[in-house]
């Protein structure tokens, strides 16, 4: 499933379209190499699974994926989880059931729950909003018109924080070289020890690369 592709492409472009920022031009987008680029590209299952882990442990507290069915975690060519693994993951969430008029544990046929903490946008279609290459199922023609795609933008955004901050009108903004206008209201989401992978991969640059893939 394209949406759970890398590690964090999940914090998509449109994702920041609703974030407040100080005026300015377009930001710098690094040309990352993704395995799924171009008509012959393929998805890296391990990368997608890491991306889901980053989303679950870092992003999901503020951002939902309400248009993504949980069952897609078992898609062939995507994350490839077993039915049992998908059911176990689904139970991590609670969803509102209109028939019960109450919340219950999610099942694979449900979608990821919506999360709108602090007005944070849903990530379901964010990467698509700035898509260039659409993985092995697309032609890449969009990139010729729109420049580098959603995965590159998201990975660049996640790694583009400079550490500089400023306060305007009672709000704190963070300098980010990839964000249009250079100043974004979202604090850096990735730190050195925020996610532990089974294979000991924990570098911010790689973790940003993977979520980006995951969401495309």
Residue ranges and their predicted role:
Residues 71-76:
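Short cysteine/histidine-rich zinc-coordinating motifs and their immediately flanking basic loops
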């Amino acid at each position: 499933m394209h949406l759970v592709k890398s590690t964090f492409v999940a914090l998509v472009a449109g994702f920041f379209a609703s974030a407040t920022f100080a005026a300015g031009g377009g930001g710098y987008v690094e040309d990352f190499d993704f395995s799924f680029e171009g008509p012959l590209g393929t998805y890296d299952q391990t990368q997608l699974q890491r991306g889901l882990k980053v989303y679950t442990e870092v992003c999901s507290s503020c951002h939902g994926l309400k248009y993504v069915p949980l069952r897609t975690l078992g898609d062939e060519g995507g994350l490839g989880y077993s039915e049992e693994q998908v059911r176990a993951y689904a139970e991590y969430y609670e969803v509102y059931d209109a028939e019960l008029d109450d919340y219950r544990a999610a099942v694979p046929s449900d979608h990821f729950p919506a999360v709108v903490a602090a007005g944070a946008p849903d990530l379901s279609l964010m990467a698509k909003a700035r898509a260039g290459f659409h993985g092995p199922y697309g032609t890449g023609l969009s990139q010729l018109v729109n420049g580098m795609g959603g995965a590159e933008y998201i990975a660049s955004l996640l790694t583009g924080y400079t550490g500089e901050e400023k306060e305007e009108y009672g709000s704190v903004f963070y300098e980010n070289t990839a964000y249009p206008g250079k100043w974004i209201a979202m604090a850096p989401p990735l730190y050195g020890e925020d996610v532990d992978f089974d294979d000991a991969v924990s570098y911010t640059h790689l973790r940003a690369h993977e979520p980006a893939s995951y969401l495309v």
